[in-house]
Amino acid sequence: MSYPQFGYPYSSTPQFLMTTNSLSTCCESSGRSLSDSAAAASAQTPVYCPVYESRLLATARHELNSAAALGVYGSPYTSTQGYGNYVTYGADASAFYSLNAFESKDGTGSAHAGIPQTAAYYPYEHTLSQYQYDRYGTMDGSTRRKNATRETTSTLKAWLQEHRKNPYPTKGEKIMLAIITKMTLTQVSTWFANARRRLKKENKMTWPPRNKCSDEKRPYDEEEEEEEEEDSQKATIKNEKKIVDEEVAREDKALDLSDLEDFDAIESESSECELKQPFHHQPQDGHQLRQRDCVNDHCKDVILKMPITPAANQELDRTKICHKPGVDQCEQEVLRGRQRGGESKACFQQQQILDSKPRIWSLAHTATSLNQTEYPSCMLKHQGLSSPSSSSSSSAVSTPVCVIDRRQDSPVTSLRNWVDGVFHDPLFRHSTLNQALTNTTVSWATTKGTLIDSGSLGRSVGNPTNAIKGQLPNIPHDTNKEFIAFQKSGSKMFCS
């Protein structure tokens, strides 16, 4: 058997002498007892046992192979170099191998005494061992990583003493120091960082502070101080942000409360009259006149004594003026009229009409009924103070003038004015309508004649129209005013 890859041949024949008895003795069956086998072995002659064979010497050959590959041996091994005599035994084999199994262990103390060392064996070297390469991949055992000693750090201390003003070595200087001190770059950087930290703690810092380099960390104290400063800045920013958020939330809350207050002021009013106070606000003289006239003259003199509302006060709600105050005042007058007798009949009759006829009166009823007391004062045309016939003298309000007023204040005109006042918003009413009606006394006659000529109301009105036409020449009037009044009133007569 040969090993050409190892560079030397090797014979596989046994190199130890043995006898047949020895083989038979070693290979006896296990059925025999221990005492019998011991007695048989002692009776025979000593023999050489085949302890080492070729396969048992592979480890030794492998170690020597690495030595041969490294050039320790100049030529391949042969059997003539004494490799076969690697382990030799003396003539007496019982001194090395005792066949007595019950022999004491003291006899083995001289077992290795008779084994001489061969000339081919060399002293142990760690480079020839099984783990001959260290972790850095080099054969030099002196370059292995080890702890820094005073001898190695003396070079670093000398360099630090020379560079006290700038104890920050560059990359090249670190490599040079690592080669000189046989240390790694990490060890050199760590040593310099610790040295700077130690000098700073001892207040021996002779260099200006600098920012962190890319290849090393700053001292621990500098990092702590900067972290504290950053934390304080962050805390200040958080506090300022919190204060701003609180102010914004407070402003939003105040805004919401103000909106709620406005909403309450608008929505929580229970009375409609309070909401419409700007439209209702007017002097109370008209109501006082209405109450006094209703008591004294059966609501007839309201036409003459009612003040003319100016153009700025046309926005008041006529529904409130006509119905609600009138009904309330007439209720008060009914209580007072029990003592005054017949003076309260007109107001009581007016209250009955308002209670019995809440709807709009029909044209047929208004055309057939000419009794002035059946209608409230709001349905009568407000004229008198500005008309020349009523303002001339107190005698002008006599029978002919009363007849003319009654016929001029016919239900059609009163109904028209009342509908315009109730169902039209004050913003859509022109301020010249009531002025035109009060500045002339013949506006109704002209309007009535025009309507009769067109044939729209000929059937419903009949005799009162003829009476008005017959009395028209007796009434002094101004044609210019009449024409202007007709244009102004006609444009607003039947507004939808």
From Swiss-Prot:
Location of this chain's protein in the cell: Nucleus
Region (Disordered): 203-236
Biological process terms in GO annotation: brain development; cell differentiation; dorsal/ventral pattern formation; heart development; proximal/distal pattern formation
Keywords, ordered alphabetically: Developmental protein, Differentiation, DNA-binding, Homeobox, Neurogenesis, Nucleus, Transcription, Transcription regulation
GO cellular component, one term: nucleus
Family: Belongs to the TALE/IRO homeobox family.
The protein, known as: Iroquois-class homeodomain protein irx-4
